[in-house]
Amino acid sequence: MIVITAPTGQIGSRLLDILLNEAPTHGEELRVIVRDPGKLPAAVRARVDVVTGSHGDAAVVDRAFTGADAVFWLVPSNLQAPSLDSVYSGFTRAAAGAFKTHGVGHVVGVSALGRGTPAAARAGQVTASLAMDDLIASTGVAYRALANPTFMDNLLRQVAPIRDQGVFTDTVTADRTAPVAATRDIAAAAAGLLLDRSWSGAGEVPVLGPEDLSANDMARILTEVLGRPVRYERQSLGDFRAALTGYGIGNAIVDGYVDMMRAKDDGLDGGVRRTPRTASPTTFRAWCEEVLKPAVLA
């Protein structure tokens, strides 16, 4: 039995699609934890065991982890949380206890790059995510943290300015190169680990994409794919903070985002060497052709 948390989210929904296709050939049953089962297609609900509720709730994870062999763990965003610890480790503590109570053998979690880099000491959400990984590993469960860089898919939030003004923004230096990954590759990495549980102990699995890119590189590729000029504009951390605050996001979360983006510009994502094992397949150009361009043209 594989339990999937956040099955309607960007990564979890892709993972669920993969497992629905592949799990039967591995003799695996699937269970999902979801707040609103109505967000799952009826055809999906018919093929999985559904536990309704929040996976931060002790009673919910107690039901969901009964008889479970493996768990996919992803914490949801909480833009009004009083602290980053409450978003990550605080949300995970009930599940960590349930892993031990129910003898869950393997857990795969969504985390971040940065462990071992100087920038990770004050990197907001990344620092909190790494602490969550340590909490899960301390239970003795076999654990793999998917160590991810910035998602290509984050650009979908900027479809309107890309389409209407030919511009996208970020806070990083324009020519600083770093890995970027597609969420579909993160889901595929999770599926591989959940279906082949021959691994043990605790560790990280970096998902780095096939190449490092700068914001200027991304602007060039966007221009070529969309057939129209697209440029990058660097946003100051002060303006970034003001924009997040204007959206009504809580102070603790805003502080974390600002610290994380500062750390990324200080090399947070550059501490892992790309190898055939860590290089995920989707190029930024392919992602733009297959995902971003249709969204821009819609």
Segment roles from a protein language model:
Residues 1-40, 56-59, 66, 77-86, ...:
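Oxidoreductase cofactor-interface core, primarily capturing Rossmann-like NAD(P)-dependent enzymes
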Residues 45-69:
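Conserved Rossmann-fold cofactor-binding substructure of NAD(P)-dependent oxidoreductases
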Residues 49-51, 144, 231-235:
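General small-molecule cofactor/ligand-binding pocket signal
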Residues 87-92:
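Aromatic "clamp/platform" in nucleotide-sugar-dependent glycosyltransferases that forms part
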Residues 200, 237-298:
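A hydrophobic C-terminal alpha-helical subdomain
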